Amino acid sequence: MLTLASKLKRDDGVRGPRASNPASDSTRRVSVRDKLLVKEVAELEANLPCTCKVNFPDPNKLHYFQLTVIPDEGYYQGGKFQFEIEVPDAYNMVPPKVKCLTRIWHPNITETGEICLSLLREHSIDGTGWAPTRTLKDVVWGLNSLFTDLLNFDDPLNIEAAEHHLRDKEDFRNKVEDYIKRYAR
């Protein structure tokens, strides 16, 4: 089977140094992204948190993959949460697009899958947003941390969930457990 990594190695050997060609700018941008992804995916797989699994439906498309987070502590322990990660052509100048595919009761994730994680923001006033020095490993570790130390009730995206926690922590826990039973097994 031809993988993206072997194709890129083969293509570099055939083409040699690239000449400047305006017609190939968009192709070159995709190639830059794909070359970065070959390295980053290898690093990611070597440094994956023990509570995470990655799945590449097509090994030749490293720009699209799924992440499963299975928290082993806290409110979300026992759940299996699926995320879809799509890396745009302009990567690493812009962050990957991430969506939670599992319905969840969480202050930083909406029930429709939008995610509040500062490193996924293209522009951030506090300097914690996306930067070209960040990698897929940072994204995966950040998503994993949303279930533990980055769980943030003070700056929520899902205001209703955060207010629920503030009002009645035990009822919040019960609703989280109900969502896990219904949607995250």
Swiss-Prot record:
> Which reaction(s) does its UniProt entry say it catalyses?
[E1 NEDD8-activating enzyme]-S-[NEDD8 protein]-yl-L-cysteine + [E2 NEDD8-conjugating enzyme]-L-cysteine = [E1 NEDD8-activating enzyme]-L-cysteine + [E2 NEDD8-conjugating enzyme]-S-[NEDD8-protein]-yl-L-cysteine
| PROSITE patterns hit by this protein | UBC_1, UBC_2
Please give the residue ranges the record annotates as the region Interaction with UBA3.
1-29
Put simply, this protein is called: NEDD8-conjugating enzyme UBE2F
The EC number(s) attached to this protein equal 2.3.2.34
Provide one Gene Ontology biological process annotation: protein neddylation
Described function: Accepts the ubiquitin-like protein NEDD8 from the UBA3-NAE1 E1 complex and catalyzes its covalent attachment to other proteins. Together with the E3 ubiquitin ligase RNF7/RBX2, specifically neddylates cullin-5 (CUL5). Does not neddylate CUL1, CUL2, CUL3, CUL4A or CUL4B.
| Pathway recorded for this protein | Protein modification; protein neddylation
